[in-house]
Amino acid sequence: MNLLIMGLPGAGKGTQAAKIVEEFGVAHISTGDMFRAAMANQTEMGRLAKSFIDKGELVPDEVTNGIVKERLAESDIAEKGFLLDGYPRTIEQAHALDETLKALDIKLDGVINIEVNPESLVERLSGRFICRSCGSTYHKVFNPTKVEGTCDVCGGHEFFQREDDKPETVKRRLDVNIAQGEPIIAHYRELGLVSDIQGNQDIDDVFADVKKAIAAIK
């Protein structure tokens, strides 16, 4: 069984990916792991990727696509199947993946799309704040301090928010992800591969829906 998992940052995609891998025994292929392995093993594409990263440059699509192809050609994929996580990120990469799968004679069985309302994601992702004295991390909704305005760990009263966690920054990041993701989802929807999963639920309820979707695919 060969699957792709998609979802916006904060939608719980990583959590569900880990559960799918544990439950179904497929190979978990994440972009970060692929890059690290390719560079550590000094594959042709790994060496190319490292040359760009060492210069502080973005790795071009051709190299990223090549690393994915190298990974999908490994023997465990034929044995176990895969869950691809974090790729494709653009419609161009999606088309490149189509070509790679065709060249390797691999069939993509389904796309699990974790859907969460972007407004609730802004709240989820921008709620983090940090104690200036000791660095302890809290969340306005999910992990507040026991006493408002006082750090549980050191008793400090000064907190700050990282630039990346501010609502306007989070919203901009989500807007970019939505703009990139919509044509990819549309592409796979045309192929009849997408299963939409409501992500605004308890983690176990989300996974119950994921399992139902996978059972329908199988």
UniProtKB/Swiss-Prot annotation:
* Record keywords: ATP-binding, Cytoplasm, Kinase, Metal-binding, Nucleotide biosynthesis, Nucleotide-binding, Transferase, Zinc
Q: Which residues form the signal peptide?
A: none
The entry marks the following residues as binding ATP, namely 10-15, 128, 137-138, 201
Which region ranges are annotated with the description LID?
127-165
Location (main, coarse): cytoplasm
Q: Where is this region: NMP?
A: 30-59
Q: What enzyme category does the UniProt record give?
A: transferase
Q: Which residues bind AMP?
A: 31, 36, 57-59, 86-89, 93, 162, 173
Q: Where does Zn(2+) bind?
A: 131, 134, 151, 154
Main role? Catalyzes the reversible transfer of the terminal phosphate group between ATP and AMP. Plays an important role in cellular energy homeostasis and in adenine nucleotide metabolism.
UniProt domain comment: Consists of three domains, a large central CORE domain and two small peripheral domains, NMPbind and LID, which undergo movements during catalysis. The LID domain closes over the site of phosphoryl transfer upon ATP binding. Assembling and dissambling the active center during each catalytic cycle provides an effective means to prevent ATP hydrolysis. Some bacteria have evolved a zinc-coordinating structure that stabilizes the LID domain.
What is the name of the protein in this document? Adenylate kinase
| Annotated organism of origin | Streptococcus thermophilus (strain ATCC BAA-250 / LMG 18311)
